[in-house]
Amino acid sequence: PEFGVPTGNFGDAFAGWAGRKIGGNIGHIHAAVNRNDALAQAINTGHYVRHQATETASVSMDVQAPSNFERLVFEASGRHAEGTKGVFDNFNATGNVHLSGDLQNALRAQVTASTISEDETAQTIKYAHDKWNKVICPHTAVAVAAALKRNDGQPIIALSTAHAAKFPEFVTKALGFAPDVPEAIWK
């Protein structure tokens, strides 16, 4: 199956890629990011620019320079250490680097990415409740929204990374009511 992965530092997505590399039954990896979308821009356009991170409801994903992205670039470059070092030395010095067309194509062959807005995140929390009677957190909603956007007919699993009770204000606003919180969450 394919996987939609909520992505901040790109660790879970890279772990999925590595699992596939060693023979795991892992299909395509689709990185789902919030409006802090430097990773998605790098994969989709080849232009990797560090911006100031902005706070979102999916706060663990508020990252503009994902630490694990360098690992994927290294692998996509054919494990070319000097080339990868050059890309990230340039990025670290300037906050801006343009990836070559070959590298960009190699990256997209490994991972695709979508940017999900705060409105889409809220709408997806409501959709998950209305359609499946599930209350999901903002991080999970970003992954579900990206999976729904992918819509290529292949089964896709959206990773869920937190409990919705950790985000009561945003989830309540999205649903229009305060969901029940399991007793175990309060302990």
Kindly label every feature range from the protein language model.
Residues P1-K187:
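PLP-dependent amino-acid enzyme catalytic core
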